[in-house]
Amino acid sequence: MAERKVRVRFAPSPTGALHIGGVRTALYNYLFARQHGGDLIFRIEDTDSNRFVPGAEEYILESFKWLGIQFDEGVSFGGEYGPYRQSERREIYKKYVQVLLDNGKAYIAFDTPEELDAKRAEIANFQYDASTRVGMRNSLTLPKEEVEALIADGKQYVVRFKIEPNEDIHVNDLIRGEVVINSSILDDKVLYKSADELPTYHLANIVDDHLMEVSHVIRGEEWLPSAPLHVLLYRAFGWEDTMPAFAHLPLLLKPEGNGKLSKRDGDRLGFPVFPLEWHDPKSGEISSGYRESGYLPEAVINFLALLGWNPGNDQEVMSMDELIRLFDLHRCSKSGAKFDYKKGIWFNHTYIQQKSDKEIAELFVPVLKEHGVEAPFEKVVTVVGMMKDRVSFVKELWEVCSFFFVAPTEYDEKTVKKRWKEDSAKCMTELAEVLAGIEDFSIEGQEKIVMDWIAEKGYHTGNIMNAFRLTLVGEGKGPHMFDISWVLGKEETLARMKRAVEVLK
């Protein structure tokens, strides 16, 4: 038998912003597909029309575009297995619901929500299963004629899966090994509702995966309890031979490790849990995103890849190509992964250092414009090269290097008190004269002449340099002094020195 082609899918519901845990699931599917020369399918699971949120689907697609996770087929991408939106597959699902009814694997139930609530009040831990279905209003207990009459009269119903009692169900998981669950703990899940003529998640999921020839289902651990039901559905349809392999990924946990990561954790600790900023159309609430917070997509990808997986060595920084080469589902953890958001910041810092000065400068130009600064691009590149090792986010560059673009209008009081001596005004006036006479205003050209002048005058080097820095920067920060004066140029350097002497003398 020929080896089966790898086909995996990511199938979100358009119910709001995409959680960062969903991004990791999509990433692992993408890495697995690329490593095996397979296909990644983008499917929209919109069977629950009540939870539909306008703009959510577009948001999800934009998130993956930013992150560089590319789909091969699906909604917005086309393909031979469509339609890829579940709400457009109603007739397909109806056909397979009928297959289960015809072979006795499912039945029709007419119980109203009120009747079910009454049962729950009457019986502790009530579930609709082999022990209780005999006392309910369904096609197993009602005469065939009555069932047909109720349907003809427009009586609303659901189709339930008929779970056989006390049967061991084996789920082979690529991460967790064999998981065995007894069917007695499962209820007769609703597979279809006549009210909206749509299936529930479970039926649509199985039918779509089968018809789209999905080879591996890689999804979050929260779906592990549903896996036995899915195995039974494959068996009921006679699809066991082509049932996909399962891999249930570890949960993303709170930074403290106690419980599942939520948006509240991000709000509490100040980090995003969504890839992009999200404007909730219902509540009006705006939630922060990794892109708008200044994270580089490569850093987010690298950070997420290591939440629940490791390459088997100490390597941490990996490009997408390296991740594709190294990724192995068998190296995924069974236990949850703490969401160490500080590690995400470290990755962003690392990737900023790895990018060229020109690339970071291109990202910094919009920040400068926000502050009303228009500067020659060559100057921006030079400044970035000097200062990027001091920041973890591009927007932080403004905090550490704004003085390169805007002259100080005031001078830090603590620095003035500590660094501006009685003779500083006189010394800076003399230094300005020395600098004015320098023809070669390069870093080396300035340094040699100024240091010779200091030695000749017998001045204290630290006092001169501290005062010089204060005149150009306005405080005691910044790189090497002659780097600053070289970038500013002779004219701007002398103008700043003159103004500082006038203000501070």
Swiss-Prot record:
Q: Which UniProt keywords apply?
A: Aminoacyl-tRNA synthetase, ATP-binding, Cytoplasm, Ligase, Nucleotide-binding, Protein biosynthesis
Q: Which residues form a coiled coil?
A: none
Matching Pfam families: Anticodon_2 (PF19269), tRNA-synt_1c (PF00749)
- Domain of life here? Bacteria
What are the recorded GO MF terms, alphabetically? ATP binding; glutamate-tRNA ligase activity; tRNA binding; zinc ion binding
Binding of ATP occurs at K263
What subcellular locations does the record give? Cytoplasm
Write down the InterPro entries for this protein, in alphabetical order. aa-tRNA-synth_I_cd-bd (IPR045462), aa-tRNA-synth_I_codon-bd_sub2 (IPR020751), aa-tRNA-synth_I_CS (IPR001412), aa_tRNA-synth_I_cd-bd_sf (IPR008925), Glu-tRNA-ligase_bac/mito (IPR004527), Glu/Gln-tRNA-synth (IPR000924), Glu/Gln-tRNA-synth_Ib_cat-dom (IPR020058), GluQ/Sye (IPR049940)
Q: How does it assemble?
A: Monomer.
Family of the protein in this entry? Belongs to the class-I aminoacyl-tRNA synthetase family. Glutamate--tRNA ligase type 1 subfamily.
Q: What does this protein do?
A: Catalyzes the attachment of glutamate to tRNA(Glu) in a two-step reaction: glutamate is first activated by ATP to form Glu-AMP and then transferred to the acceptor end of tRNA(Glu).
Q: What is this protein called?
A: Glutamate--tRNA ligase
**Can you name the source organism?**
Bacteroides fragilis (strain ATCC 25285 / DSM 2151 / CCUG 4856 / JCM 11019 / LMG 10263 / NCTC 9343 / Onslow / VPI 2553 / EN-2)
